C-alpha cells in the first residue's frame, strides 16, 4: 500500500525554503501591481505625501491583520488532520454537526462556493501575474513594448504544456529562486526607504484612518485595490498539508512579510520623492542597469506563482471528486515519490483556454486588476464563517471570545468584499460568473448523485440475505475471480444481477469491492482495507481513502492478498461494473432541465476503468437505467 508520506520529516529550514517556493508565490508577486492600482487615475486620489502615507499604512495594516493575525495565528490552527483549504475546513466543521441539519447544508454550500471562487481566482492569477512582469519591458526596453502580449501568451502556453510532464525537477529550484526574489524585494525597498525615511511614518495606523476620513468614498474604492496585497493569503492555509504550519509561519515572519513591507514602503518613498513614478513604481525602484534582469526575475517569479495556483486547482479538483461534488475525471500522478503531485488534463486545458481569452480581452494588468480581488475576498469571508463554526463547535471556545475575534475579522473581510463589489462592472463579473457557473454545476452534480443513491436504495435488494440464498441454491460456478465494484456494501450490485440473469454463473472467488471517502485527508494504511469472509468464496471488501488520496484497485487487491493469503492474477480476474444511464423524468427531485444537465455530466464523467486504474481488457460493463 502507499505510504502516507505527507508527514513532514525534513528539517524546518528546508521545509520553510520549499514553502517559500510554493506557498508565497502569489502574495509575493503582488508588489508588481498593487500600489500602482491603488493610485489608478479612476480613483481620483491625489499623489500627495499624506495620501501616499495613508495608502501605505492601509497596505501595511491589511497585511498584519488579515495575513499575520487571522491566517497565521488563528485559521492555520483549524487543520483537518494537518490539511488546510476551504474544503478541508468545511469537512472539519461538518464533522461536529448533524449531516441532515439545515446548518450542515448551509455550511456545505458555503464551502463549495468558496472552492468555486478559488477557480474564479485561478484564471486571473496567472494572467495578471505574468502580464504585469512582462510589462516591465515597457520601462526597460520601450521599443519592445509591442511584444508584451505575445510574450505573455507564449509563456502561459509553455507553462500549461509542461504540466503533463510534472514539475518535480524544476520544482526544486522554486524555493531558492523565490528566496532570491524576496531578498531583491527587500533590497530595492530598503534602498529607497533610506533615501526618504519619512515614509516610515506610515507604520502609524492614524495615517490610514486620516486618509479614510479625508476621502471617504474614494478611499473605500481604494480598498478594492488594497486587497490586491492579500491575494495568495488563502494559500498559506490551503498548502498547509504539504509543508506543515511551522515552516509556513517561519517563512512568513522571517522573510516574506519583512520583504513585502520593505518593498511597499520603498515604493511609497519613491512616489513621495517622484510622483511621476506611479507609471510603474515597482520597476522604477531599480536602477537602469538592473531593469532587464529584474524583468527576467519577475517573469520567473510570476511563473512560479502561477504554477502554485495551477497545482492548487488540480488538488482542489481531486478533493472535490473524492468528496462527491465533482464528476470523476482522469487524474495522472506525475511523481512516484510525491503522492500529491498530480495532473488533471481536463482542468489544465480548460484553465489555459480561459486564461488566454482573458489575456487577449483585457490586454493589460491595469485592466485585469479590476477583475482581481472579488473572488479572493469572497473566499476570505467564507473561511472566517467556517473557522467560527470550528471555534465554537469543535474547539468549544468561549462564545463571547469567538464573537470578539470573528467580529474583527468579519468587519475587515466584509469591508474588502464590499469594496470589490464596486468593481463588478469593470471586470469583477468575470470571476463571479465563473464561480457562480461552477457552483451551479457542482450543486447539480451533488444533488443528482443523492437522487440516484435514493432511487438505487429504494429499488435495491439487501445483499446479505441474497448471498445466503445464493449459497443455499448456487448457480454454476466457474473458475477465476470476479470483482464487483459497488457504491453500497449493503445492496446487491446491479452488475451481479445482470450477470446471473444472462450468464447464470458465479465465479469461484467473488469479491464485492466498495470505496468510501472519509472526511480526513489521509487514511492510515492499517485502517485502509477491511475484508469480510462470507463463506463459499464470497468476500466483502471495503477500501477507505481520504479526500486527498486517489483510489487504487491494484493496491487494494495487494493488501487483500497479503492479509488473507490470496493471489490475484489480473489476466484471470474480471471486473464487473454497472454502466448507469440516467433518464430525466417528472419524478420529484430536481427540475427537468437540471436533471438534463446532470445526465450530461454523468455521461461525460471519466470511466471507472480510467479513474480506478483498472485494465480495460478485464472489464465487463453491464448497463442499467435509472430514472430521476
From Swiss-Prot:
One of its GO terms (cellular component) is plasma membrane. It catalyses: K(+)(in) + H(+)(in) = K(+)(out) + H(+)(out). Keywords: Cell inner membrane, Cell membrane, Ion transport, Membrane, Potassium, Potassium transport, Symport, Transmembrane, Transmembrane helix, Transport. The chain crosses the membrane at residues 15-35, 55-75, 104-124, 142-162, 173-193, 210-230, 252-272, 281-301, 342-362, 372-392, 400-420, 426-446. It holds the Pfam family K_trans_C. The keyword Transmembrane helix applies. The keyword Membrane applies. Belongs to the HAK/KUP transporter (TC 2.A.72) family. Transport of potassium into the cell. Likely operates as a K(+):H(+) symporter. This is Probable potassium transport system protein Kup.
Amino acid at each position: 500500500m502507499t505510504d502516507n508520506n505527507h508527514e513532514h520529516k525534513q528539517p524546518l529550514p528546508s521545509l520553510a525554503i520549499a514553502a517559500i517556493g510554493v506557498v508565497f508565490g502569489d502574495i509575493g508577486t503582488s508588489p508588481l501591481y498593487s500600489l500602482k492600482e491603488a493610485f489608478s487615475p479612476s480613483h481620483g486620489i491625489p499623489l500627495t505625501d499624506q495620501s501616499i502615507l495613508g495608502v501605505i499604512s492601509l497596505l501595511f495594516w491589511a497585511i498584519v491583520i488579515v495575513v499575520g493575525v487571522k491566517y497565521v495565528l488563528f485559521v492555520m490552527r483549524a487543520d483537518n488532520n494537518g490539511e488546510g483549504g476551504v474544503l478541508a475546513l468545511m469537512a472539519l466543521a461538518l464533522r461536529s454537526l448533524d449531516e441532515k441539519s439545515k446548518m450542515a447544508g448551509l455550511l456545505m454550500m458555503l464551502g463549495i462556493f468558496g472552492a468555486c471562487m478559488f477557480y474564479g481566482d485561478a484564471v486571473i492569477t496567472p494572467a495578471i501575474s505574468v502580464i504585469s512582469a512582462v510589462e516591465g519591458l515597457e520601462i526597460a526596453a520601450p521599443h519592445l513594448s509591442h511584444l508584451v502580449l505575445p510574450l505573455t501568451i507564449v509563456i502561459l502556453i509553455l507553462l500549461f504544456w509542461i504540466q503533463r510532464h510534472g514539475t518535480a525537477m524544476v520544482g526544486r529550484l522554486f524555493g531558492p529562486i523565490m528566496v532570491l526574489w524576496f531578498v531583491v524585494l527587500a533590497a530595492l525597498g530598503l534602498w529607497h526607504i533610506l533615501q526618504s525615511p519619512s515614509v516610515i511614518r506610515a507604520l502609524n495606523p492614524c495615517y490610514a484612518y486620516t486618509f479614510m476620513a479625508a476621502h471617504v468614498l474614494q478611499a473605500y474604492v481604494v480598498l478594492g485595490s488594497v486587497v490586491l496585497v492579500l491575494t495568495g493569503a488563502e494559500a498559506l492555509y490551503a498548502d498547509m498539508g504539504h509543508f506543515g504550519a511551522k515552516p509556513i509561519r517561519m517563512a512568513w515572519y522571517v522573510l516574506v512579510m519583512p520583504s513585502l513591507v520593505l518593498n511597499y514602503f520603498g515604493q511609497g518613498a519613491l512616489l513621495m520623492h517622484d510622483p511621476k513614478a506611479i507609471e510603474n513604481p515597482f520597476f522604477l525602484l531599480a536602477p537602469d542597469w538592473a531593469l532587464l534582469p529584474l524583468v527576467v526575475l519577475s517573469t520567473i517569479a510570476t511563473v512560479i506563482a502561477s504554477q502554485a495556483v495551477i497545482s492548487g486547482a488540480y488538488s482542489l479538483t481531486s478533493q472535490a471528486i473524492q468528496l462527491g461534488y465533482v464528476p470523476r475525471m482522469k487524474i495522472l500522478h506525475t511523481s512516484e515519490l510525491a503522492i500529491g503531485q498530480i495532473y488533471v488534463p481536463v482542468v489544465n486545458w480548460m484553465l489555459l483556454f480561459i486564461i488566454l481569452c482573458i489575456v487577449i480581452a483585457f490586454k493589460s494588468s491595469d485592466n485585469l486588476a479590476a477583475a482581481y480581488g472579488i473572488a479572493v475576498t469572497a473566499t476570505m469571508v467564507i473561511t472566517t464563517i467556517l473557522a467560527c463554526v470550528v471555534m465554537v463547535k469543535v474547539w468549544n471556545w468561549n462564545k463571547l471570545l469567538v464573537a470578539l475575534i470573528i467580529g474583527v475579522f468579519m468587519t475587515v473581510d466584509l469591508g474588502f468584499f464590499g469594496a470589490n463589489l464596486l468593481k463588478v462592472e469593470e471586470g469583477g463579473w468575470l470571476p463571479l460568473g465563473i464561480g457562480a457557473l461552477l457552483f451551479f454545476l457542482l450543486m447539480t452534480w451533488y444533488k443528482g448523485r443523492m437522487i440516484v443513491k435514493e432511487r438505487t436504495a429504494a429499488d435495491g435488494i439487501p445483499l446479505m440475505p441474497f448471498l445466503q440464498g445464493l449459497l443455499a441454491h448456487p448457480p454454476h460456478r466457474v473458475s477465476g475471480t470476479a470483482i464487483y465494484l459497488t457504491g453500497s456494501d449493503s445492496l446487491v450490485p446491479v452488475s451481479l444481477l445482470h450477470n446471473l440473469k444472462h450468464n447464470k454463473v458465479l465465479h469461484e472467488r467473488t469479491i464485492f469491492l466498495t470505496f468510501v471517502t472519509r472526511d480526513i485527508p489521509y487514511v492510515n494504511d492499517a485502517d485502509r482495507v477491511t475484508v469480510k469472509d462470507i463463506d463459499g468464496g464470497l468476500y466483502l471488501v471495503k477500501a477507505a481513502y481520504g479526500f486527498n488520496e486517489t483510489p487504487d484497485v491494484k493496491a487494494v487487491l495487494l493488501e487483500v492478498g497479503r492479509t488473507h493469503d490470496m493471489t490475484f492474477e489480473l489476466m484471470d480476474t474480471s471486473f464487473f461494473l454497472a454502466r448507469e444511464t440516467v433518464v430525466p423524468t417528472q419524478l420529484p427531485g430536481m427540475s427537468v432541465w437540471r436533471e438534463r444537465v446532470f445526465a450530461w455530466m454523468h455521461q461525460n464523467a471519466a470511466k471507472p476503468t480510467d479513474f480506478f486504474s483498472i485494465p480495460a481488457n478485464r472489464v465487463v460493463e453491464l448497463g442499467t437505467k435509472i430514472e430521476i
